[in-house]
């Protein structure tokens, strides 16, 4: 496992946003915040946002599309997140698997993706995001927990005669409540 030092980052999710989102999740079961509001909730500068977004250029073609599509690009990684300790640990790299019940198109298949880029994982926004969400979930559950985050950023490319399908398997579900 690879422990990530998160103490050097000054980026943090605004505690008021964490609390208000946690309350909304407890009440409604979900929350939606527009991208601009997320950016402001982290005091994220435009330069930090742009530098993080550039990692989507380095995603690799998803070769596991049952529909033979060549429009989805991704990488994969999993982490243990301990918000109360401010600690994130990268777990050993392995395949991404979803059941057929959750993903009828690509389920029950071990899908191997390239790992997340080291600089993506080391970006201050990345750790601030995982720790902030972990704290939000702790508030929802009312306990300091350790969370397992399975993360697969992806990018859909559409071209003039080749449509991109954001979720060709149907409405997004990850099998986690």
Per-segment meaning from a language model:
Residues 80-148:
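Signature of the catalytic double-stranded beta-helix
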């Amino acid at each position: 496992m690879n422990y990530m030092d998160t103490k050097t980052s000054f980026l943090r999710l605004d505690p008021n946003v964490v609390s208000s989102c946690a309350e909304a999740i407890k009440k409604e079961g979900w929350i939606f915040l527009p991208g601009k509001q997320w950016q402001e909730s982290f005091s994220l500068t435009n330069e930090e946002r742009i530098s993080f977004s550039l990692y989507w250029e380095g995603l690799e073609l998803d070769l596991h599309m049952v529909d033979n599509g060549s429009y989805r690009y991704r990488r994969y990684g999993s982490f243990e997140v301990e918000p109360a300790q401010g600690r994130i640990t990268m777990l050993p790299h392995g395949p991404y698997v979803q059941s057929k019940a959750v993903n009828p198109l690509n389920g029950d298949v071990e899908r191997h993706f390239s790992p997340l880029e080291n600089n993506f994982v080391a970006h201050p926004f990345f750790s601030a995001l995982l720790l902030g969400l972990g704290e939000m979930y702790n508030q929802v559950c009312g306990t300091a927990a350790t969370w397992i985050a399975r993360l697969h950023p992806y990018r859909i490319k559409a071209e003039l005669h080749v449509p991109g399908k954001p979720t060709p398997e149907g409405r997004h579900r990850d099998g986690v409540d």
